Amino acid sequence: MKLACLGLLAALLSWPQVQPLQKAVALSATQIYISPDAHSTRMGQVRPGEVIGVQDHSGAFTQVFSGVSGWITGHDFVALDAPGADEVIFGAAAALEAEAQSDSSDTQTAQDAARLYLNLYGYLPQSPRAGEALYRGASIQWQLKMAEEPRRRTPEERIFPDDSLMRKVINKFKDTPWAARAEYQLLVEHFTCGDWFSKPDCIGKEVGRYQDYVKKYPRGPMSAQAAYDAVYREGIAWTIYSQPGKLQNQGKTDEYARKVADDSARLLQDYPHTDWAARGALVAFQVAHHSPLKLPGSTPLGGP
């Protein structure tokens, strides 16, 4: 009996040990084949950013697991533990993001870019790229969902998609350019007061939101634009209140003329040599010369 047990133990020790799968991230869309042969049955497809398990190699083929076990050609993936993996993943995401931006209808490529960014953050959170990757992935997803929302007749009816990832950027990466960018994008969630042309008081509320943002992020990457957004709205309010009709109000006209002059001067002082400072100066010039600003066809959702 003792000899039998020793024999069984020796057999178990000599049995090939199952190696854990090496985790990797796909960098491009790749077909999965049932065998290491490009003419064999296709089992599915791996999308950029998907995490795969590398099992084995056979010539130019790699056996992977991604929901199903199969074979892919080439080396369009990077192991998560490879040196510089974060830079490679970020580079692939940035390339796809640029491609998607050149064709706004290409939502699949944009989703692939977002997946790469978000998995970089999720699997390599200590990377110097992690904060930016989380922001860029979250921003792409939020913008895609925003584009899917039906157009609302009035600002009061606006509905916004889930912003939890954007909020995660703001909370986890405080005082970074990525938090500043995320918070600027989410300012529009506050713009549900009403239509500018029936409720011009709502313009003042939007001005306040932009000015509060600039106070919070005085040197942020979006601060000059936010300061201009406020001046532009002040110019629009001046235009609406100065025109003949039921909304004409000389007191409000004078008030907004002063605000445009003061805030455009501050914009020029705080953010010199920027397009936003120059555009603010143009608004101030138009108001000073009693030249109404061109009114938009409808109340915009953020921005100038």
Which role does the model predict for each range below?
Residues L3-L13:
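Sec-dependent N-terminal signal peptides
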Residues S14-A24:
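Cleaved targeting-peptide boundary
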Residues P20, P36, T41-G44, V51-G53, ...:
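Boundary regions of SH3-family modules and the immediately adjacent low-complexity/disordered segments
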Residues L27-A29, R47, G59-F61, G67, ...:
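Extracytoplasmic
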Residues S28-D37:
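Short, structured beta-strand/loop micro-motifs enriched in basic residues and often containing a Trp
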Residues H39-S40, T107, L120-E132, K168-E183, ...:
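Short solvent-exposed coil/turn linkers within tandem alpha-helical repeat scaffolds
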Residues G84-S102, P128-P150, D175-G194, P221-P244, ...:
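Amphipathic alpha-helical repeat scaffolds of TPR domains
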Residues E99-Q111, Q143-K168, F191-R209, I236-L268:
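Short coil/linker segments at helix-helix boundaries
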